A protein has these predicted regions:
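Non-catalytic accessory segments flanking enzyme active sites
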Residues: 17-89, 93, 284, 293, ...
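Glycine-rich "HGGG/HGxG" loop immediately N-terminal to the catalytic nucleophile
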Residues: 60-62, 125, 138-152, 186, ...
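Conserved hydrolase catalytic core segment
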Residues: 116, 120-123, 170-219
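Conserved alpha/beta-hydrolase
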Residues: 117-143
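C-terminal subdomain of alpha/beta-hydrolase-fold enzymes, centered on the catalytic histidine
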Residues: 240-380
Length: 380
């Protein structure tokens, strides 16, 4: 295994872009949904309009240049080439911070927070709150290599991230994550406590412990949210955790299908007042979809569910490092501090956010940055 770190730039061939436009123009559309809302899925009218825009107006070359404004690299870890952004702060005493995305996200989620985190003095902050930021693409996502063997679940990714931080010369660092990134960040806190100074998560990984008595009102809200997710929002998860390969054929072949599969979650999981374009721009949404389409990672990205909902699902991480939680009101599941304290023994920071959902850094970058700064300020 080589420890070499190689510079990387996104450069998608014209043939890939021409093929995308051809597929979009020749989409075979289904009939429209039979309801006036999103309860049967992403509405045909909107998906058709998004795909028309994608084909006729979306400027990938301009977006590609924007994505390339941050330094990117690849390095081999445990047999896989891992793609990552590494943006060092101009402030020499900055704290290293590894930030991890989930599904259906990507490193695109963090493009609005990297500059405020690395150079706070230019963004209304203090140099004492600066970070050296590392944003890896999960294995099988974006420009990271697709695993060739099974075994790439949460624990293995977490240990790989510890290797990455060591390779970059960071002997003490913080970790932050949402969605799968929260699970991986939690595993880092459990596995690499010697070097991980603390973890900050936006999706609290906890379940209700066996306690006597009736649930509190806070716990009832969480339990109702869990039930709603199980009844109405979890079909994607069941498919990806059981038959990711089957799903991959359709999504890898159809850009409209890939877009609908992803964008529906930006309706369901954002604090968007009923429509994802109320909170995120059309170009931003398509930037994220493009990192799945141009890399043909529909199946490989879905496999993290297959890997992590098997034996790993029964793994309970006991975390003793300082922990911070940012609870956004439209997160998939409302976090409950009492539940978390059964596995997280050192919760030092808990914020109830006024707005925002599952894609915290993408939706509410200022709130996200302020909370990350506030938590890690205690650990420097």
């Amino acid at each position: 295994m080589s420890a070499e770190i190689k510079p990387y730039r996104i450069s998608i061939g014209d043939d890939v872009l021409d093929d995308l436009k051809s597929r979009l123009r020749n989409t075979r559309w289904p009939e429209a949904e039979l309801v006036e809302d999103w309860s049967q899925g992403a509405p045909l009218k909107w998906i058709k309009d998004i795909c028309r825009y994608w084909s006729e107006e979306y400027d990938w070359r301009g977006r590609e240049a924007r994505l390339n404004r941050f330094a990117q690299f690849t390095t081999e870890i445990d047999g896989l080439d891992i793609h990552f952004l590494h943006v060092r702060s101009p402030h020499p005493e900055a704290m290293p911070l590894i930030i991890t995305h989930g599904w259906p996200g990507s490193v695109v989620e963090f493009h609005k927070v990297i500059e405020p985190l690395t150079d706070p003095t230019v963004h209304g902050g203090n140099a004492a709150d600066a970070f050296h930021v590392v944003c890896p693409s999960l294995p099988g996502f974006g420009f990271s290599e697709k695993p060739k063997t099974t075994g790439w679940g949460v624990g293995r990714i977490a240990s790989s991230w510890a290797v990455l931080m060591d390779r970059l010369g960071y002997s003490r660092y913080g970790a932050q994550g949402g969605d799968w990134g929260s699970a991986i960040t939690t595993a880092i806190g459990a596995q690499d406590a010697e070097h991980c100074a603390g973890i900050h998560v936006t999706l609290a990984m906890s379940t209700r412990p066996n306690v006597e008595g009736q649930p509190t009102p806070e716990e009832m809200r969480a339990l109702n949210g869990i039930q709603h997710y199980a009844d109405w929002d979890s079909g994607y998860s069941k498919q990806q955790s059981t038959r990711p390969q089957t799903l991959g054929y359709g999504l890898t072949d159809s850009p409209s299908g890939q877009a609908a599969w992803i964008l529906e979650k930006f309706w369901a999981w954002t604090d968007c007042d009923g429509h994802p374009e109320n909170i995120l721009g059309r170009d931003e949404l398509l930037d994220n979809v493009m990192l799945y389409w141009v890399t043909a990672t529909a199946a490989s990205s879905a496999r993290i569910y297959w890997e992590s909902f098997g034996a790993e699902r029964r793994t309970v991480h006991k975390v003793g490092v300082p922990t911070g939680v940012a609870a956004f009101p439209r997160e998939i599941v409302t976090p409950v501090r009492r539940w978390m304290e059964t596995n997280f023994s050192n919760i030092q920071h808990w914020s109830e956010m006024p707005k925002g959902g599952h894609f915290a850094a993408f939706e509410q970058p200022a709130l996200f940055v302020d909370d990350v700064r506030a938590f890690f300020r205690k650990l420097r």
